[in-house]
């Protein structure tokens, strides 16, 4: 706990840096909050809950959460399709953890990404890395107000599931 604020710093305090030349945007200073990658979210539509969702994964959390949300809203996937869809991760920003490094030009894609996509990205100068998984577990509940139901969706990246009642 810090002072009399009641706020525990936990491991997220490591997101701060002490020297401006390491990362000028996240230097520790009075009144500043560390960049946090914790991402539980609740989307509201027409003043009602539309989607409750979260993802694990450190600095890729925000990227994966946005891609999941866009898969549902823009690409009209159902909650399960959106949770299982491939994600692309960029490492252009300073890391929140460890040495706070960044890897300009590095992009991670799932290993089932079509070869022509990887080739095109590499032709643009990106360092493309493929992995079996590009996201931590994604879990979500979609509120179907039209039919009075809730639908759970979860990625197949672990022993995760979405439940609503």
What does each model-found stretch correspond to?
Residues 1-131:
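Proteins synthesized as precursors that undergo proteolytic processing into mature forms
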Residues 115-165:
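In a subset of proteins, long, contiguous C-terminal domains/tails are tracked
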